[in-house]
Amino acid sequence: MSMLDFDEVVEHYQRALEEFVKGNPEPNKRLFSHQEDVTLANPLGPAVRGWEQVAATMERAASNYRDGEATGFESVAKYVTAELAYIVEVERYKGRVGGSAEIVAIALRVTSIFRPEDGVWKIVHRHADPIASSRPAESVVQGT
């Protein structure tokens, strides 16, 4: 699997993510591994493992977005080998979130890990959180 192949997969992934913020998880789901070791950690809930849980989590998460569009993908890092690849990006969108009628800006810090399955790069892990800028150390403290 070449770097060129991987770059094409990343482009497909970014287009699928734009569909996701329109409320459609299906293109994104097709890019994920359907194996039991696939994991997803999104900002709307705890991390999940296994295809069935990942698919259900994606469907729930996508249902929170409407009328979205991608406004940019800022590459932080990329690494590709024959057996594993990852990207770290800041994903930027605008759209309606939850029940709000207002279009808002969305920024996510994301790490995605890929591996080849049957000659095709598949996502085996995605971690996304809304931390796209510096925060004070106390921001990690949770109330008791």
Where are these regions (language model features)?
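A beta-strand edge to alpha-helix "cap/lid" segment located at domain peripheries
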Residues: 1-27, 37-144
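Conserved catalytic core of Hanks-type protein kinase domains
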Residues: 31-34
